[in-house]
Design a protein with these regions (language model features):
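Short, small/polar-rich loop/turn modules that mediate ligand/substrate recognition or access, typified
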Residues: 19, 105, 110, 165-167, ...
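Substrate-binding pocket helix/loop in short-chain dehydrogenase/reductase
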Residues: 29-30, 37-42, 124, 135
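Residue(s) in the substrate-gating loop at a strand-loop-helix junction
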Residues: 73
């Protein structure tokens, strides 16, 4: 991670906008979840965010500008049966973002989260028709979101129009959870 940050600095002139969007799931009932499944999800979904953000924050602080956008999940706020590891990682990302936002806001660096609900993706393509029907029934807009809708939120948070927005979580979920 350190060499990646150094290369970005020397070859690209630095990173002004960081979008942390890595994530995996290894779902299972809490009482049956293995340490390996717990650790794997937290490593990818939370620890990698910590490590990469830590390395890229120092140069942003020197430049006195940056936008850090963490893609979390609605289940990081609401919880979800069978996803204790994923929910814990995504909730941790929200807490990390709020803490970091308070630490570095004075350096003109914003830190925010986007919490998508059900978005058309390879993950939701795996759901059967009955599961999709149940999900749609819980979403007031009666459809899944699109990657473009999530990207539009990221574009806003990266823009000058969001210069006074920090420590926030934008929920992109069609009204599924009105928080």
């Amino acid at each position: 991670v350190k060499s990646l940050a150094e290369r970005a600095e020397t070859e690209l002139g630095g990173v002004d906008i960081l979008v942390n969007n890595a994530g995996i799931t290894k779902d299972g009932l809490f009482v049956r979840m293995s340490d390996a499944d717990w650790d794997a999800v937290l490593e990818v979904d939370l620890t990698s965010v910590f490590r990469l953000t830590r390395e890229l924050t120092h140069p942003m602080m020197r430049r006195r500008f940056g936008r850090i956008i963490n893609i979390t999940s609605i289940v990081g706020v609401t919880g979800n049966p069978g996803q204790a590891n994923y929910c814990a990682a995504k909730a941790g990302m929200i807490g990390l973002s709020k803490s970091l936002a308070q630490e570095i806001a004075s350096r003109n660096i914003t830190v925010n989260c986007i919490a998508p609900g059900f978005i058309e993706s390879a993950m939701t393509d795996k759901l059967n028709d009955k599961q999709k029907e149940t999900i749609m029934g819980a979403i007031p807009m009666r459809r899944m979101g699109t990657g473009a809708e999530v990207a539009a939120s990221a574009l806003f948070l990266a823009s000058n129009e969001a210069a006074y927005v920090t420590g926030q979580t934008i929920h992109v979920n069609g009204g599924m959870a009105m928080i």
